[in-house]
Each structure stands twice: as structure tokens, then as C-alpha cells.
């Protein structure tokens, strides 16, 4: 099942209300929704940590298995990333995060697929970023068409960027665009 109420869910979370009829049972989707100093997602020793220096309200959504719950309504082979950070500060920002083993090329497809699926939802954000955390050394794929196209799309369409990092990455909210 693909959540069609993500926009409504974000607005309700920011006002401490609950969505009237969540099709995905949002307890499975939302991992964090508050102003904590550090918001992290991790799996199999790979970790992304957002340092919330501005104490903005941050909502951490589990995309794969939460916002997009695999069932017969989800197209077979549909690519989606692992997590979505929604930062509600001076400007609304979003970070799509993929925690990946070694197949970096596939992780780029997963972020691309999620961007495509939620294109209209993303129009409300000043910046949208892509983060890939890999378990092996970061391969030199910056010349690959998939990397170039996704990086260009994030930069030109969403005023964001793409970063690929090995194992663990801690990033300040004030340094996302660097």
C-alpha cells in the first residue's frame, strides 16, 4: 500500500493532531516526531544521524515498510528508499536516506523512485536532499549516468544535493547544502 496522505500526515504531526483515517496505520511509518537534538536511522551497522542544532521539529518516516508497505497494490519492483526526514524549521526541508550494503547504483534508483512517487508532495519543500550510506568503501560512481542524473535533479529541481558516505554519517541541519 502506498500512502496517499503523506502531506496531510506531516501537517497533522506538526500540529500534534492525528490523521483521521490513516490507510497505513501511521504507527508503522513515523519513527520520530519531535525536536530532539539528534535524529537517527540505522540498520545493519549503517547509520545516518541528523544533528538538529536549530531544534526544529523533525519527523522521521520509515518509507520502505511504512509509508510504502509492500502488498499487491504496490507495483512489483517499485524502488523506494529506506527513510525520509522532514525538517520543519525556517524552511521546510526533506532528506531521503538509503542505508545500503554495496549496490550503490541500486540505492540511487531507490531514491529516484521515491522522488518520482512523491513529486507533488515535495513541492512544499525549499530543499530536498539525498543521502546514501554504504557498508563498503564509497565507489567512484560520480561519472555514472544514474549519479549524474539524480544529482542534477536534486540540485536543479529541489535545490538540494546528493552525498554518498561509508558506514556512518553525522550531519548538522545547518550544513545540509554543503
Language model features: what each stretch is:
Residues 83-85, 93-101:
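Conserved catalytic cores of phosphodiester-cleaving nucleases, focusing on short active-site segments
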Residues 118-126, 156:
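Arginine/glycine-rich "motif VI" loop of SF2 helicases in the C-terminal RecA-like domain
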Residues 103-111, 143:
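Active-site-adjacent loop/helix micro-motif of nuclease/hydrolase catalytic cores
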Residues 114:
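An active-site-proximal "capping" alpha-helix that borders the catalytic cofactor pocket
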Residues 2-16, 132-178:
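Domain-level recognition of nuclease-like catalytic cores that cleave nucleotide substrates
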Residues 99-105, 138:
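A generic structural motif
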Amino acid at each position: 500500500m502506498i500512502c496517499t496522505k503523506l502531506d496531510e500526515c506531516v501537517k497533522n504531526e506538526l500540529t500534534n493532531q492525528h490523521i483521521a483515517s490513516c490507510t497505513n496505520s501511521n504507527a508503522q511509518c513515523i519513527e520520530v516526531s519531535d525536536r530532539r537534538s539528534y535524529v537517527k536511522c540505522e540498520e545493519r551497522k549503517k547509520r545516518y544521524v541528523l544533528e538538529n542544532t536549530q531544534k526544529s521539529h523533525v519527523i522521521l518516516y520509515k518509507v520502505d515498510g511504512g509509508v510504502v508497505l509492500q502488498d499487491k497494490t504496490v507495483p512489483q519492483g517499485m524502488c523506494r528508499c529506506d527513510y525520509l526526514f522532514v525538517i520543519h524549521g525556517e524552511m521546510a526541508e526533506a532528506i531521503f536516506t538509503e542505508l545500503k550494503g554495496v549496490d550503490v547504483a541500486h540505492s540511487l534508483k531507490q531514491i529516484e523512485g521515491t522522488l518520482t512517487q512523491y513529486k507533488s508532495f515535495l513541492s512544499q519543500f525549499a530543499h530536498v536532499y539525498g543521502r546514501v550510506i554504504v557498508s563498503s568503501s564509497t565507489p567512484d560512481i560520480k561519472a555514472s549516468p544514474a549519479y549524474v542524473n539524480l544529482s542534477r535533479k536534486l540540485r536543479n529541481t529541489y535545490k538540494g544535493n546528493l552525498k554518498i558516505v561509508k558506514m556512518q554519517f553525522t550531519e548538522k541541519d545547518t550544513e545540509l547544502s554543503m
